[in-house]
Amino acid sequence: GSEMCIRDRFDLERAWNLPLPSAPVRVKECASCRFWALCEQELVAADDISLFLPGDRAKPFRERGITTVQALIDAHLGEPSRLAAAWRAGEVLLRRGGVHVPRADIEVDVDMEAYLDQGAYLWGAWHDGEYFPFVTWEPLGGRAEAENFAAFWRWLMDLRAQAHAEGKTFAAYCYSAHGENHWMRMSAQRFGEVDELEVEEFIASSEWVDMFAHVKSSFAGPYGLGLKVVAPEAGFAWPEEDFDGEESVNARREALAGDHNARQRLLDYNCGDVQATRAVREWMDAGAPGTTAL
């Protein structure tokens, strides 16, 4: 006990004795801080490197004495310097070289919406110019979710089997497959309506394509490579802007209570996501016009 007290006191004394930072540094939390407008002026005046690389991301450069965005640009350190220059110029995407994306005769775009860690209530798909939503507004974890996932899975596998039967190639696409893979596996495990091995086989196959992986290998960008960043570069606009994660959680709660407007918003947004994924693919297939080489 006493040993802990001594160590704690030492840590506290060391913290007290550290010099207080005399200037702001941008971190992730700045986005929701009411003092950001004040700090931003100071950071912009100083051309602080944290404007481009927030938090610890700037640490290796600060240790080399590079503390401003311009210094990073002038250091000619390859990609970091090139991205800093792109950030300064407002360039969203830089091409890494050849842009590659797999195509198929029969293509489906998929986007899943889950509610917290309770389950997946919406599996949306875009195929042949049409939106197919598989959705339940019932509480999750029961028959309604089980039947909804099974209906989506049967539809997708039937489309795939039909393509194979006609000697055509098939591919289903999503943007960052982590969530979809998790809930496909979980749904098969929890409900037993869909064969787990069939799910694993599909996830591992070349017919399940993560567009995000192809975007990452084709581009670099100072603002990240999320769908909301990349799709506008491909000329796509969502029907409703900034419907963020928190808003969709609230809308889901309202939808569960029977709010038809909330239900339609969730469907419209999901429909936008699957169309955005398709737009990015077609734009990449055309060589990503409008982007600059890295």
Placement of each model-derived feature along the sequence:
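Short, small-residue-biased leader/transition segments that mark boundaries at the very start
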Residues: G1-I6
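Conserved RNase H-like, two-metal-ion catalytic cores of nucleic-acid enzymes
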Residues: R95-E166, R190
